[in-house]
Amino acid sequence: MRTTFLLLCFATSISAQTWRFAVAGDSRNCGDVVMPAIAAGAKADHAAFYWHLGDFRALYKLDEDMVREAKTPFTILSYQSAAWPDFIRYQLQPFAPIPIFLGIGNHEMVQHTRGDYVMQFGDWLTRPEIVRQRLADDANDHVVRPYYHWIQGGVDFITMDNASQDMFDFPQVAWVRRILARDAADPQVKTVVVGMHAALPHSLGCDHSMNESAQGEYSGSRVYQELLRFRETSNKKVYVLASHSHFLVRDAYDSAYWRAHGGVLPGIIIGTAGAIRYRLPDTTQGFPPERAQTDVYGYLMGIVDPDGTITFDFHEIGRSAIPADIVARYGADGVDWCFNENKDTTSHLSSVCAAADAPAGPAQRP
């Protein structure tokens, strides 16, 4: 009885405290330069964990940081075999001992399958928190998947898989519906945070999102509506995080479409962990820098209050934050390239979003 009482007191004290976690996605191209600085920031901020929303390495081309560090030139085969181990060594290991949770991005599917992903990253997909939650949901479920969830500090963190245009599939949609039903009935769960690679459809970044395929638009809209329904019926908090687009956009679902079709969920696009920086979409024209900015690296620090409210602060990683050993490894000119030249000047236009929203279905892109 005394042991039970002490455990209850400990759980109560933890749930009554403010705590933090770090999250960002898209660390290809220059992630080996940027991610160690994110790791240092997460440690300094006392983050309980780091959540990576996908796209670890480019895979369709050579990552510039790997080319810079290589002692001999890569072949296609040698690069492909080295890319994921490079990510683990240079991007994940600096976080130790902070736990890391991984989400799958579309670049993880380049020359690979989900089976390859599960084999390479099984150590992270079978973290005790994940396995314990999977078996609590279904004692007979012994399948390791790219999508999973875990409950921590009164928050259900749901990692979804939309890394290919056939996602979400029906089993994954059914799975998230079951989770939300349990969360609605669980008084210990105050908040749901859904993380994924591509943003759900009809966001301010919809030209590079689940709008890009018919299945993505249909299934992503279903999940969005399920989250709206969960929030309305349970009076619990919901936040949606994504990356895929390599910039920062807050209030990403405060779009004309969702204002007219059910409501706006709090959402942030945070694809700023080292990938080539995209131009902001014209849907963000006139936004202040705190709401939309590009040509920056950094991460979100989620600050969880005792009532389940989460405040997301953007922590920018500047050139001066890159650790000295990283500068020595890649050279000052290599680090400077990541900050000055790692940019894509392609425009992101709302006319493409309008085509995607048309009754005929999403537009085909070259």
Each model region followed by its residue ranges:
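Extended active-site neighborhood of metal-dependent phosphoesterases/phosphodiesterases
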Residues: E64-Q188, S209-Y239, S245-Q293, G298-I303
